[in-house]
Amino acid sequence: MTAHEVNFDGLVGLTHHYAGLSFGNEASTRHRFQVSNPRLAVKQGLLKMKALADAGFPQAVIPPHERPFIPALRQLGFTGSDEQILDKVARQAPRWLSSVSSASPMWVANAATVCPSADALDGKVHLTVANLNNKFHRALEAPVTEALLRAIFRDESQFSVHSALPQVALLGDEGAANHNRLGGEYGSAGVQLFVYGREEENEIRPARYPARQSREASEAVARLNQVNPQQVIFAQQNPEVIDQGVFHNDVIAVSNRQVLFCHEAAFARQKVLINQLRTRVDGFMAIEVPAGEVSVSDAVATYLFNSQLLSRDDGSMLLVLPRECQDHVGVWRYLNKLVAEDNPISAMQVFDLRESMANGGGPACLRLRVVLTEEERRAVNPAVMMNDALFTALNAWADRYYRDRLTAADLADPLLLREGREALDVLTRLLDLGSVYPFQQTGAADG
């Protein structure tokens, strides 16, 4: 059956700021306390979406979350009106305010893990929400992510959206950022590669930075998504690269159809994995980048592998890259050599995503890949699909509500909270989502 990959990109939230909340993500740590520009951030993302949609790659949007997230502060014991809580937490525990104001939901590669209908035992598209257990600010996301996905993929005859795994470290799950699918045509059955950083009975794990994904979680997600057991491979990421800042697999590898583009040090038993894939995937091609050409540290600094690998109509592939790759002499030299060689990657497109990149999120972080047949695509909420009208409407919406300068101190401003809620209220109507946010639900804003 004919199917296409649709990229659902996250809209950057109104409270996008640099707080250094994500230990193990070196860009996040390095840019802590810098002044951010939320309006520029959301527009950089929109430009990427529209350019790819105009080039013929189906594109849709996933909205931001409600931030600052007052219900979480109430759970932490802060009382009073919303405004009083903001004032108290800003004075008593500003770190908590930064955490509940994080715009991290924009990186929707961590929203869920997706199984196309061609791979599922019941023939439906499955999405399992990620619990993002390793970081407090991200562990807040799952309930609203689930509500948003149910509002987008609402036809239960075509889609199954599963709640996140229990919030315990043993089941730490980071979503599609640790998941690849390889195969031929999108509509044919593929091989799903689940990548983990640790497992309970295995002492091989990173020493410096946390391994966020457990094998136990990956196995549970594969079961929930009803992935045919004959079409699954579980592989461990190289713990040494996690300790160099590769906090998700999509910082060191990206796949599309029959191609796996990765660093030679990406996986713990890479030769064994490559041989498995060669046996299981017709026409499989591994493009392994040697450390002599691009070091792991340069790959992390430029987000070379946090790129999007997209199939064009002629069978060739386009590599969508952040501008940091073009700015790095060695990485850009390697990329120009790559597209000149005999492989499916024949073109590159560079985008300026510096607002997101400074917090440790490149092109691949900003999108959730969902393979859909034509019938399934028609069943998706049509209001989220990118086109000229939506692009114009979202830019006008951003101009109206987003600030062009934000610091950590601004997060305590009650006006920012009100601006955010008004903006999301308008957005839910624009995208026909219903009342997906806690503040929209009766009594939620009052605790």
From Swiss-Prot:
Give the signal sequence positions: none
Q: Which UniProt keywords apply?
A: Arginine metabolism, Hydrolase
Pathway(s) this gene product operates in, as recorded in its UniProt entry: Amino-acid degradation; L-arginine degradation via AST pathway; L-glutamate and succinate from L-arginine: step 2/5
The entry's substrate-binding residues are 19-28, 110, 137-138, 212, 250, 359
Query: According to the UniProt entry, what is the EC number of this protein?
Result: 3.5.3.23
| Catalytic-site annotation from UniProt | E174, H248, C365 (nucleophile)
Q: Which domain of life is it from?
A: Bacteria
Q: Which reaction does it catalyse?
A: N(2)-succinyl-L-arginine + 2 H2O + 2 H(+) = N(2)-succinyl-L-ornithine + 2 NH4(+) + CO2
Cross-referenced InterPro entries: AstB_sf, SuccinylArg_d-Hdrlase_AstB
Does the entry feature the keyword Hydrolase, yes or no? Answer: yes
**Gene3D superfamilies according to UniProt:** Succinylarginine dihydrolase (3.75.10.20)
Give the top-level enzyme category: hydrolase
The record's GO molecular-function terms, alphabetically, read: N-succinylarginine dihydrolase activity
The GO annotation for biological process reads: arginine catabolic process to glutamate; arginine catabolic process to succinate
Q: Which family does it belong to?
A: Belongs to the succinylarginine dihydrolase family.
This molecule's function is given as: Catalyzes the hydrolysis of N(2)-succinylarginine into N(2)-succinylornithine, ammonia and CO(2).
User: What quaternary structure, including any partners, is listed in this protein's UniProt entry?
Assistant: Homodimer.
Query: Which protein is depicted?
Result: N-succinylarginine dihydrolase
- State the organism named in the record: Salmonella newport (strain SL254)
